[in-house]
Structure formats: C-alpha cells, structure tokens
Amino acid sequence: MRLEISSPQTKLPYPKTEELPFTLQELRNAIPADCFEPSVVRSLGYFFLDVGLIAGFYALAAYLDSWFFYPIFWLIQGTLFWSLFVVGHDCGHGSFSKSKTLNNWIGHLSHTPILVPYHGWRISHRTHHANTGNIDTDESWYPVSEQKYNQMAWYEKLLRFYLPLIAYPIYLFRRSPNRQGSHFMPGSPLFRPGEKAAVLTSTFALAAFVGFLGFLTWQFGWLFLLKFYVAPYLVFVVWLDLVTFLHHTEDNIPWYRGDDWYFLKGALSTIDRDYGFINPIHHDIGTHVAHHIFSNMPHYKLRRATEAIKPILGEYYRYSDEPIWQAFFKSYWACHFVPNQGSGVYYQSPSNGGYQKKP
C-alpha cells in the first residue's frame, strides 16, 4: 500500500491476502540487471567521501575549538558517522562489491571506529532480513505480545518503549526483548559454529579501538573524548535507532506468525520514508522496501529499482512522506505490543483502549 500520510490521524487499510498476487521472480525480472551490479569505484567513492568529510570536520572543530561550534559539529559529525555506518551496512550485505575480502576490510574500517562489531552485527542483521515481519523470529524492532509486554520488567519497558533512541549500544550486548546473546561473544546463539572466528576478529578490532580511545583520553583528558567522540557517537546512535525504528514500526503494518508468514510477505512489511535533504547524505537508506526484497543491491541503485517494481507492487508498496519526527512520535505512542494470538495483527499500546484490528 502506498501511504501518503499527511497527519497522525491518517489510517489506511492493508490488503491482507493469503498469497501475494506476484512472485519474487516477477519483481526481479522487472528490475534492470545492472541494478544488481555494484561498482567498486563508486562504492569506494562513497566510503572515501564519508571518511574525508569526517576528517575535515574534525580538523575544523580542532582549529576553531569553540563551544559555539561544538553543538553544530556534534550534529554534523554524528550524522556522518551514521552515513559511514550505511557504507559498512552495504559491505555486510555483499552489495559494496563482489569481493568478500574487500567487503570485510571496508566493513571493518567503516564500523569499528563507530563501535559496531562488523561481523557480529552483519550476522544478526542477516537474521533480521531473513525473518522480517515474523513476530517470533525477526531480530530487530519486532513486537512483543501483550502478555509478554505485561511481564516485562520496568527497565525493559523504559528502554524499549520510552527511550528507544538510545537502545542500540545495549542491543549489541543483550539483543532485544525475549532474545538471548551478545554480538561480541562467539558462543552467542546468534552465531553458527563456523562463524566464531569472524566474530572474534571484529570483537578484537573493536577492543583495540576502545584501547585507542582510552589512550587519547589518557593523553588529552575526558573533556577531549566528550567533545570529539562521545557527543558525535550519541548523535549517531540516535540516527541509527530512529531510522531503523521508523522502517519497521507503524500501526498500519501487519505482523505475522507461523505458516502465514513467508519471506516476500515479510519483506513488504516495511516502509520507504523521506528524510528530505538528509536522503543523499545517508545514502538513501530511506529507500527500504526494495532493499528488503533484494538486499544484495547497492544503495545507489535502490531508487531506480523501486521505480521498476512499484507498478507490480501496486497497493502493497508503502511510502510515507510524513515529517520524520511526527512519524516517530506517532509510532512511539501507538506501537507497544500485538495480540497474543493470530496472524496479520497490528500494533497497539496501553493508551488506546486495547486491541482493535485495523479495517
């Protein structure tokens, strides 16, 4: 369904059917073949652009050394950290290049400086893509049942539902509600036995970078660390949580259980969103529907692919141009849990008087 949301009150139905009227192969056939071909030169160009901008703003902030400029610097630098994360995200999907070695190198260079364990995150993100829209097996921003919601400890509810924009660092250590494991430990249930060495590689790389930050703090003090790293990092965390939350949290998105779920149906349970002038800065990550259907497609080919599949998707395509913060707070209040049973169910919250299925 194409959502053209102009106000928080807009409610549009979702055409729920047992089977979608198109197949994954039909969608793939509609997309130009070159959309699946990454360009190493172009991909590296985005990586070096982000790194160059980050280095440039570090130099500018150090040169000015002004508390009037620092808040601006934090917003810009944190946003650029987020952009660099998206480059590493492409590496994790294998859409940066066809070389696994290059993908892993650039992935580590992109993610380690922003405290993301590349392989640990890559693997859990793979699980998310393989199970999107499945209440029981999705990895990120999935709903809990009303029963589990009522059983959650107060601090779990606080973090998941009232402080969601700072949840990511804790997720790396503890995953999401009702899931066990850590992104840093090779023995975590997240990982297969053959993935342990890769997970350890990323964990050691991140530990080395934390040691480097400790050395800088020892040399220049805590205020230096706060000004030049912690504050931009927190902005990055907000961006990551905000964007991923909005891609998968909306009171008109159905969630599935059991045999009623399958990959394509789940992949369509996400939304394209418009971030305005930020779109090119964070590499069009808001073009999310096509990405979930074909995650091996480079980010710079997603807009073209989206236009190619929209005629086939028809009302199954979701797009929102609702202002980002308005969309966030609408879902923030409306989306807390789903019914204990059933499939094709929708988010509800304690404040809306109980479960009422959308028309």
UniProtKB/Swiss-Prot annotation:
Disruption phenotype: The disruption mutant loses the ability to desaturate fatty acids at the carbon 15 position. It catalyses: a 1-[(9Z,12Z)-octadecdienoyl]-2-acyl-glycerolipid + 2 reduced [2Fe-2S]-[ferredoxin] + O2 + 2 H(+) = a 1-[(9Z,12Z,15Z)-octadectrienoyl]-2-acyl-glycerolipid + 2 oxidized [2Fe-2S]-[ferredoxin] + 2 H2O; a 1-[(6Z,9Z,12Z)-octadectrienoyl]-2-acyl-glycerolipid + 2 reduced [2Fe-2S]-[ferredoxin] + O2 + 2 H(+) = a 1-[(6Z,9Z,12Z,15Z)-octadectetraenoyl]-2-acyl-glycerolipid + 2 oxidized [2Fe-2S]-[ferredoxin] + 2 H2O. Its EC number is 1.14.19.36. A motif (Histidine box-2) lies at residues 125-129. Its cofactor is Fe(2+). Induction: The level of transcripts is negligible in the dark-grown cells and is enhanced about 10-fold by exposure of the cells to light. Low basic levels of the gene transcripts increase rapidly upon exposure to low temperature and decrease again to low levels in cells shifted back to high temperature. Expression in cells grown at 22 degrees Celsius is 10 times higher than expression in cells grown at 34 degrees Celsius. The induction of expression is completely blocked in the presence of rifampicin, chloramphenicol and 3-(3,4-dichlorophenyl)-1,1-dimethylurea (DCMU). One of its GO terms (biological process) is unsaturated fatty acid biosynthetic process. One of its GO terms (molecular function) is oxidoreductase activity. It is found in: Membrane. One of its GO terms (cellular component) is membrane. Pathway: Lipid metabolism; polyunsaturated fatty acid biosynthesis. It comes from the Bacteria. A motif (Histidine box-3) lies at residues 291-295. Its main location: membrane. The chain crosses the membrane at residues 44-64, 67-87, 153-173, 206-226, 228-248. Keywords: Fatty acid biosynthesis, Fatty acid metabolism, Iron, Lipid biosynthesis, Lipid metabolism, Membrane, Oxidoreductase, Transmembrane, Transmembrane helix. It is a multi-pass membrane protein. A motif (Histidine box-1) lies at residues 89-93. It is an enzyme of class 1 (oxidoreductase). Belongs to the fatty acid desaturase type 2 family. Desaturase involved in fatty acid biosynthesis. Introduces a double bond at carbon 15 of linoleoyl and gamma-linolenoyl groups attached to the sn-1 position of the glycerol moiety of membrane glycerolipids. The histidine box domains are involved in binding the catalytic metal ions. This is sn-1 acyl-lipid omega-3 desaturase (ferredoxin). It comes from Synechocystis sp. (strain ATCC 27184 / PCC 6803 / Kazusa). The gene is desB.
